């Protein structure tokens, strides 16, 4: 009797040893596609003990005993590891490198006759068509998730705009403020935060205007709104002068690793382009015939579409012709701009919302022509007005006037002589008629004539 009790105890111990290990509550881990995922496994002993990692269908992944690591024949063989530095603290994590969506499943850690289940869910967030987009293009953020999951995602742009959705988020008409880090949070029981860097390819300014006096040197600058370590592409500046009927190409160039190589350049006007970034052009002289608008384009290698910047040139000219002082501007200007002429340190003599103003008989001295917008002076030109005087009479004018006077005198004399001659002719005819009448009367009263011509009584 006494000998059977130890045997029953021994049998009970053997049966307990053959039972499966006790399973604790499942831990859920959210991981990012392409990154390292850490699955936790800990023991209360806080010391190094043997442990094993398996899949839910009992395929061995990794095991450690006496610091000796063994790897099973699984799809993770070349992507798994553990933190040896944490084993002595009773922590035996499984590290999965380059995590993939298909790695999402339940993993089992066996340690101290216990089983700890860890459910891994791997998510991916991709930007389409790319993380580098041209200004004005649309951005689509697509969430990849494990089968059977139903996550939601919320993204916040650098400008603070929030968008929410399930699998796909779209943003149209990207601008420079959208360039930067986008923070996207995936909600699937837990939260997983993605940070994705979006670069909007654009010039810092969509449009710029340069105001210059006639004859001054002009600098056009086209700084980029993004940092570029290696930039390759080609560009062109097409110009539409205000006085021209059509636009023409002023310059074309190639950009190779931030070096500028000019291909073709016009000879009129004289242009010079810088060899380094930022892209910039120099026009030797600002002349009225060059005033107008240009379209500067840059096509980047591997990108569909072009970067655009509009550039305008406004030129001011002040002239004095005889007794007229005139100020004019050429180029694209707003109807709100004010053009004024005034003596220095005095009130404006004339001020109009037009492209030309003038003053008749200007006082001698220093005059100023101002182009302003709501009181802000955009362009100023100074001019020293000379005393005005009556224009000298030209010899040709005297000759013409003398000829006209002589012609008038000759014509008057001719008319006078004709009238006088006609008057004398009429007077002679009248005297002749009187003489004839008198002659006839005398003949009729003669006696011998009367006797011959009169009939007897």
UniProtKB/Swiss-Prot annotation:
GO terms for cellular component: cell surface; plasma membrane. Residues 418-457 are cytoplasmic. A lipid is attached at residues 418, 421 (S-palmitoyl cysteine). Disulfide bonds join 41-109, 155-184, 327-369. It is found in: Cell membrane. GO terms for molecular function: coreceptor activity; MHC class II protein complex binding. Residues 1-25 form the signal peptide. Residues 126-202, 203-316, 317-373 form the Ig-like C2-type domain. GO terms for biological process: adaptive immune response; cell adhesion; T cell differentiation; T cell selection. The modification Phosphoserine is found at residues 432, 439, 455. Residues 26-395 are extracellular. It comes from the Eukaryota. Keywords: Adaptive immunity, Cell membrane, Disulfide bond, Glycoprotein, Immunity, Immunoglobulin domain, Lipoprotein, Membrane, Palmitate, Phosphoprotein, Repeat, Signal, Transmembrane, Transmembrane helix. It is a single-pass type I membrane protein. Residues 26-125 form the Ig-like V-type domain. Glycans are attached at residues 254, 295, 324. The chain crosses the membrane at residues 396-417. The keyword Electron transport does not apply. Palmitoylation and association with LCK contribute to the enrichment of CD4 in lipid rafts. Forms disulfide-linked homodimers at the cell surface. Interacts with LCK. Interacts with PTK2/FAK1. Binds to P4HB/PDI. Interacts with IL16; this interaction induces a CD4-dependent signaling in lymphocytes. Interacts (via Ig-like V-type domain) with MHCII alpha chain (via alpha-2 domain) and beta chain (via beta-2 domain); this interaction increases the affinity of TCR for peptide-MHCII. CD4 oligomerization via Ig-like C2-type 2 and 3 domains appears to be required for stable binding to MHCII and adhesion between T cells and APCs. Integral membrane glycoprotein that plays an essential role in the immune response and serves multiple functions in responses against both external and internal offenses. In T-cells, functions primarily as a coreceptor for MHC class II molecule:peptide complex. The antigens presented by class II peptides are derived from extracellular proteins while class I peptides are derived from cytosolic proteins. Interacts simultaneously with the T-cell receptor (TCR) and the MHC class II presented by antigen presenting cells (APCs). The Ig-like V-type domain mediates the interaction with MHCII. This is T-cell surface glycoprotein CD4.
């Amino acid at each position: 009797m006494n000998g059977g009790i130890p045997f029953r105890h021994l049998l009970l111990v053997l049966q307990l040893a053959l039972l499966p290990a006790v399973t604790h509550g499942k831990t859920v881990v959210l991981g990012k596609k392409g990154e390292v995922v850490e699955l936790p496994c800990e023991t209360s002993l806080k010391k190094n003990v043997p442990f094993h990692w398996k899949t839910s269908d009992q395929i061995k992944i990794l095991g450690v005993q006496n610091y000796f690591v063994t790897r099973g024949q699984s799809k993770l063989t070349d992507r798994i590891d553990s933190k040896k530095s944490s084993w002595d603290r009773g922590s035996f994590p499984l590290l999965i490198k380059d995590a993939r969506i298909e790695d999402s499943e339940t993993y089992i850690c066996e340690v101290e006759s216990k089983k700890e289940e860890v459910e891994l869910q791997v998510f991916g967030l991709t930007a389409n068509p790319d993380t580098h987009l041209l200004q004005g293009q649309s951005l689509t953020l697509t969430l990849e998730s494990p089968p059977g999951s139903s996550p939601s995602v919320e993204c916040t742009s650098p400008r603070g705009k929030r968008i929410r959705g399930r699998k796909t988020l779209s943003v149209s008409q990207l601008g420079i403020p959208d360039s930067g880090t986008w923070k996207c949070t995936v909600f699937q029981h837990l939260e997983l935060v993605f940070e994705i860097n979006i670069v909007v390819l654009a010039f810092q300014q969509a449009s710029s205007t340069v105001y210059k006096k006639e004859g001054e040197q002009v600098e056009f600058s086209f700084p980029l709104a993004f940092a570029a370590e290696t930039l390759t592409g080609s560009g062109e500046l097409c110009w539409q002068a205000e006085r021209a009927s059509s636009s023409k190409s002023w310059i074309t160039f190639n950009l190779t690793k931030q070096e500028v190589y000019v291909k073709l350049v016009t000879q009129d006007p004289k242009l010079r382009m810088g060899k380094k970034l930022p892209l910039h052009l120099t026009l030797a002289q600002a002349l009225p015939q060059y005033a107008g608008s240009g379209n500067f384009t840059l096509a980047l290698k591997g990108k569909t579409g072009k970067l655009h910047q509009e550039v305008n040139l406004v030129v001011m000219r002040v002239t004095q012709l005889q007794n007229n002082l005139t100020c004019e501007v050429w180029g694209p200007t707003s109807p709100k701009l004010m053009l004024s002429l005034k003596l220095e340190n005095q009130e404006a003599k004339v001020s109009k919302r037009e492209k030309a103003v003038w003053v008749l008989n200007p006082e001698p001295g220093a005059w100023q022509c101002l182009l302003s917008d709501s009181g802000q002076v955009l362009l100023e030109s100074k001019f020293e007005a000379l005393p005005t005087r009556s224009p000298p009479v030209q010899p040709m004018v005297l000759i013409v006037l003398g000829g006209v006077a002589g012609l008038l005198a000759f014509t008057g004399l001719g008319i006078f002589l004709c009238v006088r001659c006609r008057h004398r002719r009429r007077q002679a005819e009248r005297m002749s008629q009187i003489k004839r009448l008198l002659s006839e009367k005398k003949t009729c009263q003669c006696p011998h004539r009367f006797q011959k011509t009169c009939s007897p009584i």
